[in-house]
């Protein structure tokens, strides 16, 4: 029944004239009949009593009217038919939504609504309670208590329903909020050799994405090609830089310069140096800002590779060198001091570990394992035992003779051997020596401390011995490597024999003065221009001079030896390409001239040119790492 119908019916009821006494009597008869039927069914708790007065009958009438017809209920309060028109207007309130109003068509014999008994004592005024009997009063109190309990249960249920509704609303708002302004896309985890297209939604910011979204970096592993193409909406978003690991070709095409630079991590293995689109080759071990439009900073952790060991064009035999040979060269280039420091650090860590494993000295456990209090049973037992012993001693004291008592009294008390005291709570005897309690515990603590110190000292001595052994081993290894390096450092004997006579001939004949400044300038400029040409071409340039012909013959002689068979002059590759391309000044020599020849330098331009030509064929192969230290 709707609220409007309830309001109209209540207004009609208020507009009706006051009921006469006959009408009241008729209604009273009807309601008593209905209430008697209810009592037979056992659903009603209100019993009509003949001993009750007129007020009691009126109370029952109003109760039955409120429960049977249900039309007089305008809220939670009852409707008294004797009230005037103004009182009804003042008491009229809008019905609450929790009240279920019954229609006239329903039978009064169905007093249950939603399983609850609706026969309630609505009029609980003080007069009615005073006039009613004690049994009636107790019944009313019980019923009111039940109603209160039911209302409390209903309130708890409503609170729980409200909480569940709030939780459902929160869970329903979460997916909608995820598609809202705070979009967090999880990073795609890509493994293996995969090609991620530029149109993929995980790496491309589409125009339909809502601004303010935060995209974590895509985690890319292995040899992948990632081409991230950001749309024009990238300026309103926080796009994290992609993490690139390994030898990946990372092509970045950005329409706006707001994207962060890619973070280039170290390669997992020795691979050729990476080439970024529109940039120059990044040499390993260097950190450069590449000349891309968005000024991305490419950070590369240095790792030795085959392509990063040379800065210029390399000979074909050296370009085919494997990464393992390069790694061996780098490993050999490590200084023994660094190895020694690493070994010392490992020893120190091991010493710390052993020191932590040594347990600290623990004090001895006290023998009295209880507190002397009256709440402790063991202490009470001991007190009782002491009382018993004392009683026995007192009873037996009369039987002991005077001589025995004198002997007991004349006995000297104990004295501590260490501290010479004659009083303690407990005497200790160890090896015939009587000691007090304090001295005994202090001796035990000292012994434990000495044992702990000896353990620590033994651990330190062991670590020191290991460190000394390691230093001796490293010294032996250093001596061995120095002797191995000293052997190839000596120049070839045939080269020495060639050099010395040529020098003597040059100084004897006095042809050193024939060379003028212009010829030396021309020779040095031609050498600097054609440093990548064949050695034959270099030698033909100076064929006018007899000294250069002698040097050419020395070159041919050296090239025939077995040790230098790999550097044959007939190859079309330039041997000068193994060193740096530096423009040579007048009579300038290279920085890595052999130490055996550095002693014979003179101020003469002829000698400097001869030294340069002879140094073109080194006596030993210079390692590749020597040019890039």
From Swiss-Prot:
GO MF: protein-macromolecule adaptor activity; zinc ion binding
GO biological process, one term: regulation of stem cell differentiation
GO CC annotation terms, alphabetical: nuclear speck; nucleus; NuRD complex
Basic and acidic residues composition bias: residue spans: 25-35, 82-95
Region annotation CR1: where it falls in the sequence: 140-174
Alphabetically ordered keywords of this record: Chromosome, Coiled coil, Isopeptide bond, Metal-binding, Methylation, Nucleus, Phosphoprotein, Repressor, Transcription, Transcription regulation, Ubl conjugation, Zinc, Zinc-finger
Gene3D superfamilies in alphabetical order: 6.10.250.1650
Annotated positions of the Asymmetric dimethylarginine modification: 536
Subcellular location: Nucleus speckle; Nucleus; Chromosome
Residue segments, region Interaction with ZMYND8: 177-290
Chain intervals for the UniProt region annotation (CR2): 335-478
Modified residues (Phosphothreonine): 20, 185
Chief site of localization: nucleus
Glycyl lysine isopeptide (Lys-Gly) (interchain with G-Cter in SUMO2) cross-link site: 89, 174, 200, 229, 462, 485, 547, 581, 601
ZnF locations on chain (GATA-type): 410-462
Subunit structure, as described in the record: Homooligomer. Component of the nucleosome remodeling and deacetylase (NuRD) repressor complex, composed of core proteins MTA1, MTA2, MTA3, RBBP4, RBBP7, HDAC1, HDAC2, MBD2, MBD3, and peripherally associated proteins CDK2AP1, CDK2AP2, GATAD2A, GATAD2B, CHD3, CHD4 and CHD5. The exact stoichiometry of the NuRD complex is unknown, and some subunits such as MBD2 and MBD3, GATAD2A and GATAD2B, and CHD3, CHD4 and CHD5 define mutually exclusive NuRD complexes. Component of the MeCP1 histone deacetylase complex. Interacts with CDK2AP1. Interacts with CHD4. Interacts with ERCC6. Interacts with HDAC1.
Xref: PANTHER family: TRANSCRIPTIONAL REPRESSOR P66-ALPHA, TRANSCRIPTIONAL REPRESSOR P66-RELATED
Name by which UniProt lists this protein: Transcriptional repressor p66 alpha
Organism from which the protein derives: Mus musculus
